């Protein structure tokens, strides 16, 4: 299996009233996160976000207006237990944040090898449930981003 590229997309799926989709990891039950995944060779970051969204949830981003690039990135240390997936010596990943608004909480099709279950929670309840600081931080910033997008319209 080829090594993963240490560049990823995080996709916050949310409703207009700021309920957020969280997924429970299959490899670490009790670890909750938004849609996330590594870039593949030749992909743009938007393509990575769109592909991961479809793979992990079955959601077609184009059917909901496409993902929105927050033009925000975070660098974080890769957990030692996951470093074997990356080229030797790789210790950090750069994550780029995207969002997708859906009209209401929708039923998702989980990839069972990746996730056990999902929840739709108000953003203030979803943020502390995430094991990743960058995921928590992105959810905490969701109200400002959504309000800014509404002002621009």
Question: Where are each of the predicted segments found?
Answer:
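Short, well-ordered beta-strand micro-motif
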Residues: 13, 24, 99-101
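The catalytic Nudix box helix
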Residues: 34-71
């Amino acid at each position: 299996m080829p090594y993963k590229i240490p560049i990823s997309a995080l996709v916050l799926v949310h409703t207009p009233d700021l309920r957020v989709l969280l997924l429970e990891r299959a490899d670490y039950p009790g670890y909750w996160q938004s849609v996330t995944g590594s870039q593949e060779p030749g992909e743009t970051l938007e393509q990575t976000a769109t592909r991961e969204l479809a793979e992990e949830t079955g959601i077609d981003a184009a059917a909901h207006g496409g993902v929105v690039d927050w033009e925000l990135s975070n660098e974080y240390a890769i957990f030692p237990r996951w470093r074997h997936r990356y080229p030797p010596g790789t210790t950090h990943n750069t994550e780029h944040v995207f969002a997708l608004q859906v009209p209401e909480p929708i039923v998702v099709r989980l990839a069972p090898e990746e996730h056990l279950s999902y929840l739709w929670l108000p953003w203030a309840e979803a943020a502390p449930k995430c094991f990743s600081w960058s995921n928590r931080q992105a959810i905490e910033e969701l109200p400002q981003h959504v309000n800014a997008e509404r002002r621009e319209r």
